[in-house]
Amino acid sequence: MNVVDSSGWLEYFADGPNADDFAGPIADRANLIVPVITLYEVFKRSLQQQGEEAARVCVAAMQEGRGVEVDADLALSAAKLSFDLKLPMADSLILATARVHGATLWTQDDDFAGMSGVRYIPKPKG
């Protein structure tokens, strides 16, 4: 199972330098888990940068994976991770979703570098 965080989705949709690193887990829709917080973050950023039509296309592609909403158990797991690891709320919800589902978290967010169960792809310098 795989979770791609918002930075990975945005890199993929922008066809950025690391897009190919995220293409595999994104293409494997049967094993793709999509936390609802990533829908929010990607829609908002795409709306700002490309407009509503493009943002809706991005979210439609994301919804081909299995969406996971936040319930009480996930919220509490995320809060504990946030406290223990000093992560922002969205990051802790994404990491908690991956861990609850036994999934690998794919990201280029350096907040996750070196964490267990995380495939961290550094952003190119420059």
Q: Residue ranges of each PLM-predicted region?
A:
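Short, well-structured N-terminal submotif of metal-dependent ribonuclease cores
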Residues: 1-34, 46-58, 126
